[in-house]
Regions:
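Extracytoplasmic
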Residues: 1-119
Length: 119
């Protein structure tokens, strides 16, 4: 996650919301990049209690149960980037079939997609 955090720091503006695929990636991301805002950090229960609908949608997206996830990620969560480790095959399959999801960073541990606006 260190490489992904460094890429985000170098290529995004301060305060940019980042949609991460696992809440437990937050400590690594935040340690290496404090300039961005992260959707879920420290404990996912905070989002679950504060906004059950957003929580349930986040879970569905991260588990690859939402087709064309870009619209929800950008319009519902305000996140122009998605970051995750390389173990989210179901989400990666959905992202690969979404014309508005573009891989902008990839290493052996992590992947970042840019969420493009619809044409």
């Amino acid at each position: 996650m260190q490489g992904a955090a460094a890429w985000l720091h170098a290529n995004t503006e301060a305060g940019t919301m980042i949609f991460q695929l696992d809440w437990d990636d937050f400590p690594y991301l935040f340690f290496h990049n404090t300039q961005n805002a992260y959707l879920v950090g420290l404990d996912p229960t905070y989002l679950q209690l504060a906004s059950p609908d957003l929580w349930n949608l986040w879970v569905s997206i991260t588990q690859g149960r939402v087709e064309q996830p870009s619209g929800f990620i950008l319009n519902t969560y305000g996140a122009p980037y998605v970051v995750g480790d390389r173990q989210h095959d179901a989400f990666a399959d959905q992202a690969a079939n979404d014309p508005n999801m573009q891989i902008v960073y990839l290493d052996q541990y992590s992947i970042i997609w840019r969420v493009n606006t619809s044409d």
